[in-house]
A protein has these predicted regions:
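Enzymes that bind and transform nitrogen-containing heteroaromatic metabolites
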Residues: 1-172
């Protein structure tokens, strides 16, 4: 299984200063539970924003001398990262950022996307190139949580999309 997971505000924003534009602990806990024990594919900037990085994290960067933490691997392309992540025998999750989602979605059979029911300021948008309208919604549930920056209640819609036909990884 190759899946992607992320969250997006109602105005399409998914990041601000290499982190989330919102502070919703329950949504972050959902992310952590969902990816627990998986191999992760992540872009360099998202990787640098992470306090805790599990083993079997594959960091996509063009910087050949980029040093990663113990248990992680630097890779030059999304395809190489996905191949190496699959070789671990674990489920694989693509966790961002935007350019990594845009490059990886054709290979994903699932996309776990939380839609945050409020606009947020941000500097990174969810990629318009991902045609989720052509995917099948296989799970859809809503919860209301407190967003800690604003103190307001926010609806989080937890969606799981299935892509009926996904692209096989090219042979090495």
């Amino acid at each position: 299984m190759i899946a992607a997971i992320g969250a997006v505000a109602s105005n399409g924003m998914l990041g601000l200063n290499n982190w989330l534009p919102w502070d919703i602990p329950e949504e972050l806990a959902y992310f952590e539970r969902t990816v627990a024990g998986a191999a992760l594919v992540v872009g360099r900037l998202t990787y640098e924003s992470m306090d805790v990085v599990p083993v079997d994290t594959f960091v996509v960067t063009g910087q050949k001398d980029y040093a990663v933490r113990s248990g992680c691997q630097r890779v030059a392309s999304v395809e190489a990262a996905l191949r190496q992540a699959l070789a671990t025998g674990k489920p694989v999750f693509v966790i961002g950022g935007a350019s990594i989602y845009a490059a990886a979605w054709p290979y994903c059979d699932r996309f776990f996307l939380t839609r945050i029911g409020k606009p947020f300021d941000g500097d990174t948008r969810f990629p318009d190139s991902i045609p989720l309208d052509r995917w099948t919604v296989v799970e859809d549930r809503e919860e209301r949580y407190l967003e800690r920056h604003s103190g307001e209640a926010v609806v989080c819609r937890f969606l799981q999309y299935a892509q009926p036909v996904f692209k096989p990884l090219p042979a090495v």
